[in-house]
Amino acid sequence: MQIDEQPGNAIGAAVEGFDHATASDADIDALKSTIYTKKIAVLKGQDLSPQQFLALGKRLGRPEAYYEPMYQHPEVTEIFVSSNVPENGKQIGVPKTGKFWHADYQFMPDPFGITLIYPQVIPEKNRGTYFIDMGRAYDRLPEDLKKEISGTYCRHSVRKYFKIRPHDVYRPISEIIEEVERKTPAVVQPTTFTHPMTGETVLYISEGFTVGIEDQDGKPLDEELLKRLFDATGQLDESFEHDNIHLQSFEQGDLLVWDNRSLIHRARHTTTPEPTVSYRVTVHDERKLHDGIQAA
């Protein structure tokens, strides 16, 4: 296995010769260290079945299936499927997922530490995923803004981007919203926390899932504060030219693994009617999102 920093990129590394089936514990430790410090590891030359992809995920931590079944792979439920390509006339997975800034499972009480994405069918145009390193973004905040958010908490919810399921057709929207709030109530996390693997300070907000900010007593703060944070970190830049934004491209055989604690991401969906399919596995590693979350 050879790990090389991606040339010209501030974050990321290319990993050649990685085989999850034969990798030693030292190889796995080196890979995970790269994920935490370089944020994105691109495993090159991968050719895996769904079962093998899950096995790779298990080398890095404990996989968890997505809570809504319509996203799950029909044979391997721990695989989340994003696809606009029907199989035998049947929709497998969900098309155009993640077209907004977010961290995976940010709206849940116990988010994942590591995300793995394995593109299956890659469009010719507009391929890739946008990322923002929220540790680096925090470092770049003005000092007065850092002081303003010190000791605050943010509320995260899936409600804004929840996708209607097949069995929701003809149901009253109020009934669907009530179910969403009951199954996935908003969660509160510190606005910033110390990354347990690197010691860096992470700004844990996303335009997609973060819906409010409050003081340490739970009193809501002005929504304008959140908007200023979104703007300062680059999440409101629709040109995607902000200094904080990194576009990670990929080719057939690439498998992306990234640090879900400090990165937020946004899918770059093709604007042309091209087929696109990707698989995702998300895993819990040795530590919780931050040390303020109690171990189960």
UniProtKB/Swiss-Prot annotation:
(3R)-3-{[carboxy(hydroxy)methyl]amino}butanoate binds at residues 66, 71, 98, 105, 163, 280. 2-oxoglutarate binds at residue 269. Pfam families: TauD (PF02668). Gene3D superfamilies: Clavaminate synthase-like. Its cofactor is Fe(2+). Fe(2+) binds at residues 102, 104, 265. Involved in the biosynthesis of a unique class of isonitrile lipopeptides (INLPs). Catalyzes the conversion of (3R)-3-[(carboxymethyl)amino]fatty acids such as (3R)-3-[(carboxymethyl)amino]butanoate (CABA) to (3R)-3-isocyanylbutanoate (INBA) through an oxidative decarboxylation mechanism, thereby generating the isonitrile group of INLPs. The keyword Repeat does not apply. GO terms for molecular function: dioxygenase activity; metal ion binding. Signal peptide: none annotated. Isonitrile formation goes through two consecutive, but distinctive, 2-oxoglutarate-dpendent reactions catalyzed by this enzyme. In the first reaction, an Fe(IV)-oxo species is utilized to generate a (3R)-3-{[carboxy(hydroxy)methyl]amino}fatty acid. Then, its conversion into a (3R)-3-isocyanyl-fatty acid likely proceeds by decarboxylation-assisted desaturation. In PDB structures 6XO3 and 6XOJ, the 2-oxoglutarate seems to be in an off-site binding mode (overlapping with the substrate binding site), which is not the binding site required for the reaction to proceed. The latter seems to be inducible and requires His-269. It comes from Streptomyces coeruleorubidus. Belongs to the TfdA dioxygenase family. (3R)-3-[(carboxymethyl)amino]butanoate binds at residues 66, 71, 98, 105, 163, 280. Keywords: Dioxygenase, Iron, Metal-binding, Oxidoreductase. It is an enzyme of class 1 (oxidoreductase). Its EC number is 1.14.11.78. It catalyses: a (3R)-3-[(carboxymethyl)amino]fatty acid + 2 2-oxoglutarate + 2 O2 = a (3R)-3-isocyanyl-fatty acid + 2 succinate + 3 CO2 + 2 H2O; a (3R)-3-[(carboxymethyl)amino]fatty acid + 2-oxoglutarate + O2 = a (3R)-3-{[carboxy(hydroxy)methyl]amino}fatty acid + succinate + CO2; a (3R)-3-{[carboxy(hydroxy)methyl]amino}fatty acid + 2-oxoglutarate + O2 = a (3R)-3-isocyanyl-fatty acid + succinate + 2 CO2 + 2 H2O; (3R)-3-[(carboxymethyl)amino]butanoate + 2 2-oxoglutarate + 2 O2 = (3R)-3-isocyanylbutanoate + 2 succinate + 3 CO2 + 2 H2O. InterPro entries: TauD-like_sf (IPR042098), TauD/TfdA-like (IPR003819), TfdA_dioxygenase (IPR051178). This is (3R)-3-[(carboxymethyl)amino]fatty acid oxygenase/decarboxylase.
